[in-house]
From Swiss-Prot:
Functional pathway: Alkaloid biosynthesis; nicotine biosynthesis
Annotated segments matching region Disordered: 15-50
Organism taxonomic ancestry: Eukaryota, Viridiplantae, Streptophyta, Embryophyta, Tracheophyta
Protein name (record): Putrescine N-methyltransferase 2
HAMAP family tied to this protein: Spermidine_synth
Amino acid sequence: MEVISTNTNGSTIFKSGAIPMNGHHNGTSKHQNGHKNGTSEQQNGTISLDNGNELLGNSNCIKPGWFSEFSALWPGEAFSLKVEKLLFQGKSDYQDVMLFESATYGKVLTLDGAIQHTENGGFPYTEMIVHLPLGSIPNPKKVLIIGGGIGFTLFEMLRYPTIEKIDIVEIDDVVVDVSRKFFPYLAANFNDPRVTLVLGDGAAFVKAAQAEYYDAIIVDSSDPIGPAKDLFERPFFEAVAKALRPGGVVCTQAESIWLHMHIIKQIIANCRQVFKGSVNYAWTTVPTYPTGVIGYMLCSTEGPEIDFKNPVNPIDKETAQVKSKLAPLKFYNSDIHKAAFILPSFARSMIES
C-alpha cells in the first residue's frame, strides 16, 4: 500500500492504485478511538465483513485518490473529498498540518486529519463566527481572535470601519506559514496597522489580558481535543469574561447538534456560570463539516443588554451600515442572523433544560 498521508486520528489520502489493507490506521480495520467499521480483511478483490458478507472490490465505497476524515468525535462515519493535488504536509510542534487541492471545494486545510476550512465551502463558518457577534454590538473597536491563523476570520472582520485594534493569537506558526505561502491575499491582512499577530497560547494570552479591554472576542478554534481542548473549559471562559468590557461579547465554535449535544450542554453549563449578560446557541450549515452543520456559543458580559437575535449593526447590503471595499458577503445577511438562533425541537429542549 502506498500512502501519502496518514494522520493521527485515522484520516488518510490514498494514491491511485493504493488499497486500504487490514492493520493500517486508515479506517478499514480499527480507528485510533477503538471503534471498528465492520471490515476485517481484503482478499481477491473483495472486502470481508465481520458478519460474513462481502463487498465487491470494484464497489464505489472505496476509491483511490480521496481524503477521508475519521475522528473519535464522530465515530461510525466519515467524510471524503477527492484530492487533486497535495500542496503541503508537515508536523508542527502541536499537530499534523495538511493542505490539498480538492475537486469541489478548492484548497482544504486539515489539522490532525480534521477539516478546518475549505476555500470554496468554508465561508458560511467564517462569516457567521464574525458577523453574529459583531453585528450584535454597535461600533466594535477592539477585538481579539483566538486561532484563525489562516486569516479567513480576519478577512471578514476588516469589513467593519469602526475597528481600531485586532489582536490575533495563533498557537501554531506552521498554520501562519501555510497562509503566507498559499493564501497570500489573506496573509497580507496581517500587515494591516490595526492588526497584531501573536504566536502563542490563546488561553494564556486571554488570562494575561487587561481587564475589560475588548469589545468582542472570537474563538476560532479546532475541536475540543489536542491543543484546543483548554478553549472549551470553564477557566478559559472566566478569563474571557474578565477581558471583555461590560456588555462585551464572545463567539466560539460549538460543535454539531447531531453528534455533540453532550459537549454542547457542558459548554452551555460553563457559560451560564460565567457570563451574566446572556448565553445563546446558534447554528449554521457548512458543507464540509461533520453532519453539514456547526454551532456557535454567543455570550455577553453584564452591562448594556445585548440582543444577539436582532442585529443592531448588520452589514448585508439591504441594511448596510458598514461600507467595505471587500467582496460582497456570500452567506450572511440579517435574516440568516435571526434564523441561526431557531433550533430544532430536540436541540432546543436539551439546551433549555
